[in-house]
Amino acid sequence: MEHMFPENQIENLFVGWIKKHIRNGNLTLFEEFFKTDPWIVNRCDKNGSSVFMWICIYGRIDFLKFLFKQESYPGEIINPHRRDKDGNSALHYLAEKKNHLILEEVLGYFGKNGTRICLPNFNGITPVMKAAMRGRSLNMLSLIKFGADPTQKDYHRGFTAWDWAVFTGNMELVKSLNHDYQKPLYMHFPLYKLDVFHRWFKKKPKIIITGCKNNVYEKLPEQNPNFLCVKKLNKYGK
C-alpha cells in the first residue's frame, strides 16, 4: 500500500528544501521553480514563514531584484504583509539586519504601492521597534522615511520605538538619533533631553536622562549599565 504524506507535511518539506537553496544562493534553480509556479514566493513552512520571508532573512538581494522584475506592479504576486505564527512580516526580519540596503530595496519597491510599514506583530511590536531593539539606526531612519510611526506603542509595555532604544541600552543608537539626526527626528521624541559625558571612574560615557515625564522613569531598568536616570545634575554631571 502506497504511503501517503499529509499535504501540510509535503508543503513543509518542499519549503524547507527551497529554503536551503536560498541560503546557498542558488538563484538559477529558484528562477526555474518561479517560472513554473510564481506563487512559490508565498508558500509557507510550519512556522508560517513564507519563501519571500526567507529570502529577506538570508539577505539575498539578488533574489529580490529577480522577483521585483517579474511583477507588473508591486504586490501583484508577492504578499509583503504575510505574517508568520508570531505575527512578524518580512519587514520585521529586515529591520533587525545590519545591512540596511536590503531593507531600502524592499521599502523602495513596495513603497510605491502603499505598503503598511507600521504593521505590528501579535505583541504589538512594529518593524521600527525591532530596529530600535537591535540598535539599527539606519534601519530606523529608513523605516521612518517611508512612513513608519516611531510613536506607536506596543501592546504589553506601552513602549514606543524610542522607549525600546533606551530600555535595551543601545547607547550609540540613542546618541546618534539625538545628535547626528536631531533635526528630522527630535520632533518624534519630545519626552527626553539627553546629555552625554565621561565620568572619570568609568571607561564608557553614560547617557543621562535629565528631562522627561515622570511616568517614563518607571520604564528604565535600574540595572541598565549604559543609562542613568536623574532629575537634576550639578555642573559636574553628578
UniProtKB/Swiss-Prot annotation:
Q: Where in the cell is it found?
A: Host nucleus; Host cytoplasm
Q: Where is this motif: Nuclear localization signal?
A: 80-86, 202-213
Q: Which Pfam families match?
A: Ank_2
Q: Which UniProt keywords apply?
A: ANK repeat, Early protein, Host cytoplasm, Host nucleus, Host-virus interaction, Inhibition of host NF-kappa-B by virus, Repeat, Ubl conjugation
ANK repeat segments: 47-76, 86-119, 123-152, 157-186
- Motif mapping: PxIxITxC motif: 205-212
One of its GO biological process terms is: symbiont-mediated suppression of host NF-kappaB cascade
Q: Which Gene3D superfamilies match?
A: Ankyrin repeat-containing domain
GO CC term, one of those recorded: host cell cytoplasm
Which domain of life does the protein's organism represent? Viruses
Q: Does the keyword 4Fe-4S apply?
A: no
SUPFAM superfamilies referenced in this protein's UniProt entry, alphabetically: Ankyrin repeat
- Please tell me which stretches of this chain the record labels as motif FLCV motif: 227-230
SMART domains tied to this protein: ANK
Share the record's PTM remark: The protein exists in a 28 kDa and a 32 kDa form, probably due to post-translational modifications which are neither phosphorylation, nor sumoylation.
Expression induction per the record is:
Expressed in the early phase of the viral replicative cycle.
InterPro entries, A to Z: Ankyrin_rpt, Ankyrin_rpt-contain_sf
Q: How does it assemble?
A: Interacts with host PPIA. Interacts with host PPP3CA/Calcineurin. Interacts with host RELA/p65; interaction of the 32 kDa form with host RELA results in the formation of a stable complex with NF-kappa-B. Interacts with host PPP3R1. Interacts with host EP300; this interaction inhibits the association of host EP300 with host RELA, JUN and NFATC2.
Family that this chain belongs to: Belongs to the asfivirus A238L family.
Task: Note what the entry says on domains.
Answer: The C-terminal region contains the docking motifs PxIxITxC and FLCV, which are required and sufficient for binding to host calcineurin.
The record's function comment reads:
IkB-like protein that inhibits the binding of NF-kappa-B to DNA, thereby downregulating pro-inflammatory cytokine production. Forms a heterodimer with the NF-kappa-B subunit RELA/p65 and prevents the activation of the NF-kappa-B transcription factor. Inhibits calcineurin function, which is required for the induction of nuclear factor of activated T cells (NFAT)-dependent immune response genes. Prevents the binding of substrates to calcineurin without affecting the phosphatase activity.
Descriptive protein name? IkB-like protein
